[in-house]
Amino acid sequence: MALNACGWSRYSAALAATPYRRASPSRVPPLSSPSHVADTLITDRTQLVDYIASGEKPVQDWRIGTEHEKFGFRLDDLRPPTFDGDRGIEALLKGLTRFGWDPVEEKGRVIALTRDGASVTLEPAGQLELSGAAVETIHQTCVEVGTHLKEVKQVADELRLGFLGMGFQPKWRRDEMPWMPKGRYQIMKSYMPKVGQLGLDMMTRTCTVQVNLDYATEADMVKKFRVSLALQPVATALFADSPFTEGRPNGYQSYRSHIWTDTDGDRTGMLDFVFEDGFGYERYVDYILDVPMYFSYRDGIYHDASGKSFRKFLRGELDVLPGELPTLRDWSDHLTTAFPEVRMKKFLEMRGADGGPWNRLCALPAFWVGLLYDDAALDAAWDLVKDFSLEERHALRDGVPKHALKLPFRGGTVRDLAREAVKIAIGGLQRRARLNSKGVDESGFLDALIEIVEADETPAERKLALFHGEWKGDIDRVFREFAY
């Protein structure tokens, strides 16, 4: 688990220069766990709108919440660890408690950890996710991620495990992936094949890095939502790192991104309505109400409501809970079951990037904070995308999984668009002027993206070159050379 591809030198400098403190409790309930909002009964539709609107914050209270996932593997045979056993995922979670993490159990099994507003949770096949606390700066984000990776490395080494940051599992088949013992996932596992061909791959063989960002007003939310949706394909291209399936090139640079196009059309996509006149909280609530349910959580039990209507739930007509009305916790849970390229809960979640090494786990939040948390940068980003047609937005979304930076666009390529977006983000971070103790601002965290743009080589293309060259077609090399 050497951080050879992750930049230990920058990590060490960040640790030395930035006193790590969590600014506030995380606002991000883990995807894999029920939310913890009040069990207030919903008796009026306005409560649904008010719940989202309650996320509005003054600029001084804006925070950054970064999440990332990674693949575990056994060092001896590279197979993903199961949940059980001396070298299993539960053993890893229990080992991490030595660092002050509190265990979270489901039916007597440790399935998550919490500490100071952050959480460590499990994706369906045991992908390990850190949902970071809500912090003020990218410096703090990067130290948080680095500290987590260091803790995981210490325990994983003892268990002879390693971890890999990529967008898609490069070696193992879907039927070779383990399943975690979590009620929510069993419901999704049964439902996914009914609505798409690749949903089970999404659950078991993908990893991402995401950032959650705040808005001040409804108008601010709308502008940020539109900019981030239009530029999400640019992030997909820059972070493209999933070119292998079952040991061979799959024809994509971000196969993870492609998978979302055949997972579940009812809850994925580019949300064209966000660009329509009059878009706001009300319209987003209408969209979420039309997303079929997965479950309702009551007294420690996940009740299978897959395919059911939340609108019927509001009328007390949910057949698995007859006569019961939903609570705000049900609404909070339901908001997490939509998977568009950008998602709104009480904040906006950027969902377009593949997982990757440590430096790109810092670059992803830096990219979006630079674009969205500075007024001049947000204006410039909006000027860049405001005349994109619906057809162009979809062409970008559909084309970047395969072609990434080399996708033709308006007489140039997505690389040109990415160069301009990164330039805007750099300016935004410089004007934010959030300095570490050495007086360095956050713009340096975009160095990884500058290198990708200038080289015109995505992480996927780099790995493909190695695969066809130095590795001589041996996919096992990716585990040794790109592990954390």
Which role fits each region the language model picked out?
Residues 157-158, 162-343:
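Loop-rich catalytic cores of soluble enzymes, especially ATP-dependent carboxylate-amine ligases
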Residues 71, 210-214, 349-351:
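Structured core elements
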